[in-house]
Amino acid sequence: MSQADLLDQDPVFQLKGSMLAVTILELAHNDLARLERQLADKVAQAPNFFRDTPLVMALDKLPEGEGRLDLPALLEVCRRHGLRTLAIRAGREEDIAAAQALDLPVLPPSGARERPLDIKDSAPRKPAEEVRPSAGEPRPEPAKPEEKPAEPASRPTKVVKTPVRGGMQIYAAGGDLIVLAAVSPGAELLADGNIHVYGPMRGRALAGVKGDATARIFCQQLAAELVSIAGNYKVAEDLRRSPQWGKAVHVSLSGDVLNITRL
């Protein structure tokens, strides 16, 4: 048998099953102008998290009678805000046909319970307009500035004591997230600060989602689908090549490189 024959028998690819956690944008109304405004507000609160985010566009909850959806325009709105649509979830024939015309995969409607991602509004409030007195009226005394409450000694920490199952999404706004149990494939942990997992970490862990490059990820057993700090990430295919796979590790960010070290 020649060398060429041996090379032909050597497989150049493998088909593997995988459970990936993907963000779902569930459209409630066919109003692209309003979607553009609201999406811009969300992205402004966590720009690093929404950068090149893979997305499933769910159209199966759209109410009847809202008119034909302009799918190319909808995808362009998402693209402008860094959301990359991988597939469409739909049940209506016209939506399925529109997706197929764009060569987009179509997923069937889902009956699973999906938790919304709660990103709190961090935009500053507009100052109140100054009211000027009319001529002859006494000028009111300036209001005394309100005393601001003392800053907390530490950032708030969210503690989860039960296993985090596939499809669940937990977000620690403004602080750290501590999980005292296992995290299953398909689960997603997000925190503005650090993430600690005192058990096997098999889902996705995204720390510093608002851009904190000093955030860290700690876990007792690294088997994650994805780890990310301030928008810099590694997926399971990269993580499995690390000698730290399956071990207790500490993940930190140096420049734009994720470092994984043993605990």
From Swiss-Prot:
<dbReference type="GO" id="GO:0000917">
    <property type="term" value="P:division septum assembly"/>
</dbReference>
<dbReference type="InterPro" id="IPR016098">
    <property type="entry name" value="CAP/MinC_C"/>
</dbReference>
<comment type="function">
    <text>Cell division inhibitor that blocks the formation of polar Z ring septums. Rapidly oscillates between the poles of the cell to destabilize FtsZ filaments that have formed before they mature into polar Z rings. Prevents FtsZ polymerization.</text>
</comment>
<dbReference type="GO" id="GO:1901891">
    <property type="term" value="P:regulation of cell septum assembly"/>
</dbReference>
<feature type="compositionally biased region" description="Basic and acidic residues">
    <location>
        <begin position="112"/>
        <end position="150"/>
    </location>
</feature>
<dbReference type="GO" id="GO:0051302">
    <property type="term" value="P:regulation of cell division"/>
</dbReference>
<dbReference type="Pfam" id="PF05209">
    <property type="entry name" value="MinC_N"/>
</dbReference>
<dbReference type="GO" id="GO:0000902">
    <property type="term" value="P:cell morphogenesis"/>
</dbReference>
<dbReference type="InterPro" id="IPR005526">
    <property type="entry name" value="Septum_form_inhib_MinC_C"/>
</dbReference>
<keyword id="KW-0131">Cell cycle</keyword>
<dbReference type="InterPro" id="IPR007874">
    <property type="entry name" value="MinC_N"/>
</dbReference>
<keyword id="KW-0132">Cell division</keyword>
<dbReference type="Pfam" id="PF03775">
    <property type="entry name" value="MinC_C"/>
</dbReference>
<feature type="region of interest" description="Disordered">
    <location>
        <begin position="107"/>
        <end position="160"/>
    </location>
</feature>
<keyword id="KW-0717">Septation</keyword>
<comment type="similarity">
    <text>Belongs to the MinC family.</text>
</comment>
<protein>
    <recommendedName>
        <fullName>Probable septum site-determining protein MinC</fullName>
    </recommendedName>
</protein>
<dbReference type="InterPro" id="IPR036145">
    <property type="entry name" value="MinC_C_sf"/>
</dbReference>
<dbReference type="InterPro" id="IPR013033">
    <property type="entry name" value="MinC"/>
</dbReference>
<comment type="subunit">
    <text>Interacts with MinD and FtsZ.</text>
</comment>
